[in-house]
Amino acid sequence: MAITDWPVDERPRERLLQKGAATLSDAELLAIFLRVGVVGKSAVDLAREMLLNFGSLRALLTASHHDFCVHKGLGDAKYALLQAVLEMGRRHLAEEWQRGDGLDSPLRVRQYLSATLRDRCREVFAVIFLDNRHRVLRFEEMFLGTIDGATVHIREVLKRALELNAAALIVAHNHPSGVAEPSAADLSLTRRLDQAMQLLDLRLLDHFIVGDGEPLSLREQGGW
């Protein structure tokens, strides 16, 4: 049965408009995104099948172009739409990090880093540049690597900090494996960066590692 044949108060779109998006299941939200089903399946049926095939909503949202498009009912247009929606979500979060915003909560840092770096398929090293009152000057993804690591050039980080007249930095990188445990190389890099920054009277406030769960703070783990 097509969704248009359902009672009005059971249709996902109408329920969203009446009661809010938070009241809908993952399958119902996905059905609104899909708009239509395929022969013999409503959009909700197709959405449930997709969630079952991918294993979770997150796995579906972070699927590669190829893995997404091989499923019946999907294709380039749906993949492009999904990527646009996800990017709008990231930019919405980024609006909190406009120049002049203060870092008033470690939770805000974790939320933004998780949303920005968690599901990347390659390792990314990013830097939050701050002024002497810990207000955000700029967030930049400075180095992009492979699934196993990213080469970080400390000289380039320091150069950019001086260009922005930064007084302090928070650095972060993701582990595509999802395991947010610091490696010996992570700790060594952090120590070398901290030492180099001290020579320029700059402060390294923290180094976060982003995995599947909450980003791990090396500062809270006892430093480096």
Swiss-Prot record:
Residues 102-224 form the MPN domain. It holds the Pfam family UPF0758_N. SUPFAM superfamilies: JAB1/MPN domain, RuvA domain 2-like. Transmembrane segments: none annotated. PROSITE patterns: MPN, UPF0758. A motif (JAMM motif) lies at residues 173-186. Signal peptide: none annotated. One of its GO terms (biological process) is proteolysis. InterPro entries: MPN, RadC_JAB, RuvA_2-like, UPF0758, UPF0758_CS, UPF0758_N. Keywords: Hydrolase, Metal-binding, Metalloprotease, Protease, Zinc. The keyword NAD does not apply. Zn(2+) binds at residues 173, 175, 186. GO terms for molecular function: metal ion binding; metallopeptidase activity. Gene3D superfamilies: Cytidine Deaminase, domain 2. PANTHER family: DNA REPAIR PROTEIN RADC, UPF0758 PROTEIN YEES-RELATED. Belongs to the UPF0758 family. This is UPF0758 protein AFE_0358.
